[in-house]
């Protein structure tokens, strides 16, 4: 089976510090993968590189055969990353935060709202949509 995600000798530096060094691997479609490691090992950065939120300094990342540096705009609507860090605006409702994120990816309002309703229902989050994020307890 062909890999949906392929990394070839990928490296990432931050302030001349190596975060990722020469990573090469593939993940097949439908696979369940766990990324484990110590704090500051680069797990979050790896996910940010794979999801096109960060560029690697060297090497190549392919998502469904598309080069992430050359075809980022095509890849972004097809992949997402949910950070363990809270990147939501506390003064907006959960619904407004999600709508804003959709607009950043140039998704039309109707599609955003349809998906928002569907996923909120599936994840049992409907009752939180109209609440300010700062008022939602984890």
Residue ranges and their predicted role:
Residues 36-38:
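The feature captures the beta-strand-to-loop junction immediately N-terminal to the Walker
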Residues 51:
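Helix-to-loop junction immediately C-terminal to a conserved catalytic motif
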Residues 59-67, 75:
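Conserved ABC transporter NBD signature motif
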């Amino acid at each position: 089976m062909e890999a949906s995600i392929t990394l070839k000798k990928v490296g990432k530096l931050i302030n001349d510090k190596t975060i990722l060094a020469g990573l090469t691997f593939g993940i097949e479609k439908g696979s369940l993968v766990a990324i484990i490691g110590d704090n500051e090992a680069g797990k979050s950065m790896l996910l940010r590189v794979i999801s096109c939120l960060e560029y690697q300094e060297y090497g190549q990342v392919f998502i469904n055969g598309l080069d992430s540096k050359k075809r980022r705009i095509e890849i972004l609507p097809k992949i997402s990353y949910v950070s363990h860090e809270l990147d939501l605006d506390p003064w907006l409702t959960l619904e407004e935060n999600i709508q804003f994120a959709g607009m950043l990816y140039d998704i039309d309002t109707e599609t955003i709202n349809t998906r928002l309703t569907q996923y909120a229902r599936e994840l049992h989050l409907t009752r939180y949509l109209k609440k300010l994020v700062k008022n939602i307890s984890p």
